[in-house]
């Protein structure tokens, strides 16, 4: 046997053994998952397939849909995005686009009818940006959390920035905001997005010290740090009680109270009575650095240092103006702004943190617009390796005593693998099925063990997602068990924006007490014995939109697949334009690399 044959044969044996270990571990974990399901987890599974087979239950859900949307025709828009980065010898081009598919669901007939609509000729079918950034200015766009000494050249610096993914998020959020903000006659009542909104919300909390946009002109004034604090205090909803008075961000609660009081001062007694926090604790919180930038205490009254409503209005205007220049006017200089550096004015490119801040503004504006216009906002994530349900949510609820302390063996590695393994083994489950919703705040909470004691802590220190804002769940929309090996679609991840008209009964759930984070008041949707109409409506609508016409995306809503088609089609067209852009640099010898010049001379 030759050396090459021995190498290949050794690799084959190693691969075979690794595969055997993987399959044995997966089979063992799947058996543990089934036992956990039989002992407890079955209480968190909702068999919507059986519910929807009951005509009486379907009529109740349709009645709730009519009551919520105030119509029997539900216009929707599905939004997906795409992005890329194309490196050339002197510059890199970032491309980002978002594409929307419009349609309507008619619930007058059973089964409901689905109709797609074409965009009118005077509307853009997409939102596109292509931004060429020279390597000479790479220092502005690099992410500030990496070690520069480990990067070889400017091209790798920009590669690490991942600014194109931030631009794609900005495009998707802006398109959704535009759709929600449109005329009340034509605006959708259901917005579907192909991303996890709760994850985006968490990722945009980058820290005030890393945002360089402060100083950017807004009309006759400039954006200040305190404007950023007002942005992160939003969204406001008094019926949902958000923002809450969590220990590390109580100033946001005060900003909401003063805004709801039309900018008038609020006395400390009102704070104490409304939040059940002692006066000493409030005084201590109001003397923190961020709080002192926003408010001041005078004669037991809390006075705003500036107009919070005007500040929020200006921040939204900045988001709208920059996005209009970037995505509609295709102005690459929309991402360039003046900064003062050592007493002189220079122009710099926006960093990923700056764009994340714009995404934070847009997402909060989108949320408040959806509440104002009674729009259901759903986001779908296809691929995720997270364990927010099995580790974070169940772990924290077990520690607080809400869920029983049932011994559990090793489970499959991710939430999706856990639930898909259960769906394969439990014949009684019929699609669609879903787990009970849980508050997105559990994404940032987990249980740690310290000195033999279990402590509930934040995953990112004291940065915790806003509770009572998004409800997360996992669901499956296609599972056919005709053969021994079932034909099934992947479990997908669903985020639903909470709405006071649907979710008020679930706001008085168990409190989570933490010495580091204070008291957290999440929404709690109970077990499958509780009827959650918000989730029932969203799953029913998604089931109507999941036609299973395309085998490559079976069990996935068709409008989002069509939006993905549209986004990829736009990308293919723009790719040709971008690749042709280097022609302008070929006539400039100084811009060409030594290797390029040498290789071009054939001798």
Q: Predicted segments — roles?
A:
Residues 76-79:
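Short hydrophobic beta-strand that contains or immediately precedes a catalytic carboxylate
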Residues 70-74:
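A short, charged/proline- and glycine-enriched loop
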Residues 92-104, 209-213, 395-397:
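Amphipathic alpha-helical scaffolding segments
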Residues 81-87:
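Short acidic, Gly/Ser-rich segments with clustered Asp/Glu that frequently serve as metal-coordination loops
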Residues 1-62, 67-69, 153-603:
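Long, contiguous domain-sized segments
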Residues 14, 18, 102-164:
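Compact, glycine/acidic-enriched structural inserts
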Residues 87-91, 202-205:
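Short, conserved acidic/polar surface loops in the N-terminal third of protein domains
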């Amino acid at each position: 046997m030759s050396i090459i044959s021995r190498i290949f044969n050794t690799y084959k044996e190693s691969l075979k053994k690794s595969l055997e270990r993987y399959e044995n571990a997966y089979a063992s974990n799947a058996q543990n998952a089934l036992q956990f399901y039989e002992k407890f987890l079955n209480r968190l599974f909702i068999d919507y397939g059986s519910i929807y087979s009951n005509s009486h239950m379907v009529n109740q859900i349709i009645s709730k849909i009519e009551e919520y949307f105030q119509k029997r025709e539900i216009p929707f828009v599905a939004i997906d995005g795409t992005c890329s980065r194309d490196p050339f010898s002197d510059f890199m081009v970032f491309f980002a686009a978002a594409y929307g598919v419009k349609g309507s669901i008619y619930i007058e007939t059973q089964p409901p009818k689905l109709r797609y609509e074409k965009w009118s000729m005077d509307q853009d079918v997409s939102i596109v940006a292509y931004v060429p950034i020279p390597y000479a200015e790479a220092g502005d766009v690099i992410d500030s959390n990496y070690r520069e000494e480990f990067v070889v050249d400017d091209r790798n610096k920009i590669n690490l920035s991942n600014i194109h993914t931030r631009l794609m998020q900005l495009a998707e959020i802006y398109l959704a905001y535009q759709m929600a903000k449109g005329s009340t006659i034509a605006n959708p009542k259901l917005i579907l997005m192909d991303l996890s909104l709760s994850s985006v919300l968490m990722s945009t909390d980058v820290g005030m010290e890393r945002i360089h946009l402060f100083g950017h002109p807004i009309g006759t004034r400039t954006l200040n740090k305190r404007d950023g604090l007002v942005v992160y205090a939003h969204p406001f909803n008094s019926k949902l009680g958000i923002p809450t008075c969590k220990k590390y961000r109580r100033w946001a609660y005060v900003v909401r109270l003063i805004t709801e009081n039309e900018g008038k001062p609020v006395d400390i007694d009102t704070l104490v009575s409304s939040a059940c926090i002692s006066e000493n604790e409030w005084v201590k919180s109001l003397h923190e650095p961020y709080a002192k930038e926003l408010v001041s205490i005078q004669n037991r009254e809390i006075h705003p240092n500036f107009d919070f409503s005007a500040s929020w209005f200006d921040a939204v205007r900045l988001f709208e103006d920059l996005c209009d220049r970037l995505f509609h006017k295709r102005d690459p200089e929309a991402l360039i702004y003046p900064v003062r550096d050592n007493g002189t004015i220079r122009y710099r490119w926006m960093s990923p943190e700056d764009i994340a801040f714009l995404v934070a503004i847009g997402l909060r504006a989108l949320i408040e617009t959806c509440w104002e216009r009674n729009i259901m906002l759903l986001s779908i994530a296809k691929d995720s390796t997270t364990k927010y349900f099995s580790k974070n949510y169940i772990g924290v609820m077990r520690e607080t005593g809400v869920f029983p302390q049932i011994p559990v063996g090793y489970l499959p590695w991710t939430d999706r693998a856990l639930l898909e393994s259960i769906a394969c083994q439990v014949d009684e489950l019929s699609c669609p099925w879903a787990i009970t919703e849980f508050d997105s705040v559990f994404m940032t909470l987990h249980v740690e063990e310290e000195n033999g004691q279990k402590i509930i802590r934040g995953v990112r220190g004291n940065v915790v997602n806003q509770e009572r804002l998004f409800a997360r769940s996992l669901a499956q929309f296609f599972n056919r068990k005709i053969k021994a090996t079932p034909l099934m679609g992947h479990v997908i991840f669903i985020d639903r924006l909470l709405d006071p008209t649907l979710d008020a009964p679930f706001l008085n759930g168990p409190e989570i007490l933490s010495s580091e984070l204070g008291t957290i008041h999440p929404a709690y949707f109970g077990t499958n014995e509780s009827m959650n109409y918000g989730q029932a409506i969203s799953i029913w609508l998604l089931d109507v939109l999941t036609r299973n016409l395309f085998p490559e995306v079976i069990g996935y809503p068709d409008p989002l697949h069509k939006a993905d088609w549209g986004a990829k089609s736009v990308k293919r067209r723009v790719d040709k334009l971008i690749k042709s852009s280097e022609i302008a640099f070929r006539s400039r010898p100084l811009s060409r690399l030594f290797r390029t010049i040498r290789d071009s001379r054939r001798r």
